[in-house]
Amino acid sequence: MIFQRTVQKMVKATGVGLHSGNKVTLSIMPAPVNTGIVLVRTDMSPAVAIPAKAEQVRETTMCTALVNDEGIRISTIEHLFAALAGLGIDNAVIEVDAPEIPIMDGSASPFVFLLQSAGIKEQSAPKKYLKIKRPVRVEDGDKWAELKPFKGFRVNFKIDFAHPEIARSQQHVVMDFSTSAFVKDISRARTFGFMRDIEYLRANNLALGGSMENAVVLDEYRVLNPDGLRYEDEFVKHKILDAFGDLYVAGHAILGEFTAYKTGHALNNQLVRALLAQQDAWELVSFEKEADAPVSFTVPGGVVFA
């Protein structure tokens, strides 16, 4: 049986909020089977819990934010959720003492490290996968995203930026998902932004914590970060990382092919909502044997399972 996973013990990290610029403390804790991922704002009195569900995503400008019916929000969840998805964590309680998850280095890598430090614990209930039975597609102008049947989880993603540095890099990636491929090839890709946008963002109280410590920054012609890029195709890989996180609010690992052109947080969430609304387009499945599971969540680097 392929079992659900949580973390072995609580872990904490401190960073800054990308948009607020304020210090944020994040704690990740074990949770019982079938809990899913629940985020908790501990700076509220009493603390406010928001389950990570597609319908709770009510803001997708510059990041993905969960917002409850009272308007209480937790923003910038996508990089943390990419790490949870990448390591196959089904159940966790995540406490944060601010309205946003810390940005760390702008990638999912610090969250992968944090989860590996906590240890990964297999639980007593079967892991449920969301299997795509027929294609579901959403469009917005020339942008589109689609999920269709596939035996594992494949990503086929293309971006199209006119910027010379991005245009010179590979802007199209096809990959079959596994935990090891995610950790090695995707998790270190950082968010990126343009100098020309920063003034506007800051005037709107956004990106106040943004810097070359947590983003790839470009002027009109080139990357300004002294150390350059982590991957030659870091731009498209970061968009894939974002999509992994955005799709994980479906509540389960997806079995299917995700194909996207120029998509972002808004369209990713629209796709998840469209999928879940069409109940004949998917089913939840479990696997008796490791060999039968079409997606490998084997953690690289010899992480010990409890």
Curated annotation (Swiss-Prot):
UniProt cofactor(s): Zn(2+)
CC terms in the record's Gene Ontology section: membrane
Enzyme nomenclature, EC number: 3.5.1.108
Pathway recorded for this protein: Glycolipid biosynthesis; lipid IV(A) biosynthesis; lipid IV(A) from (3R)-3-hydroxytetradecanoyl-[acyl-carrier-protein] and UDP-N-acetyl-alpha-D-glucosamine: step 2/6
Disulfide partners: none
Domain of life: Bacteria
Keywords: Hydrolase, Lipid A biosynthesis, Lipid biosynthesis, Lipid metabolism, Metal-binding, Zinc
Active site: 265 (proton donor)
GO molecular function, a single term: metal ion binding
Pfam families documented for this protein: LpxC (PF03331)
Entry's Gene Ontology BP terms: lipid A biosynthetic process
Reaction it catalyzes: a UDP-3-O-[(3R)-3-hydroxyacyl]-N-acetyl-alpha-D-glucosamine + H2O = a UDP-3-O-[(3R)-3-hydroxyacyl]-alpha-D-glucosamine + acetate
Residues reported to bind Zn(2+): 79, 238, 242
Physiological role: Catalyzes the hydrolysis of UDP-3-O-myristoyl-N-acetylglucosamine to form UDP-3-O-myristoylglucosamine and acetate, the committed step in lipid A biosynthesis.
HAMAP family in the cross-refs: LpxC
Family statement drawn from the similarity comment of this UniProt entry: Belongs to the LpxC family.
Protein name per its UniProtKB record: UDP-3-O-acyl-N-acetylglucosamine deacetylase
Organism: Shewanella oneidensis (strain ATCC 700550 / JCM 31522 / CIP 106686 / LMG 19005 / NCIMB 14063 / MR-1)
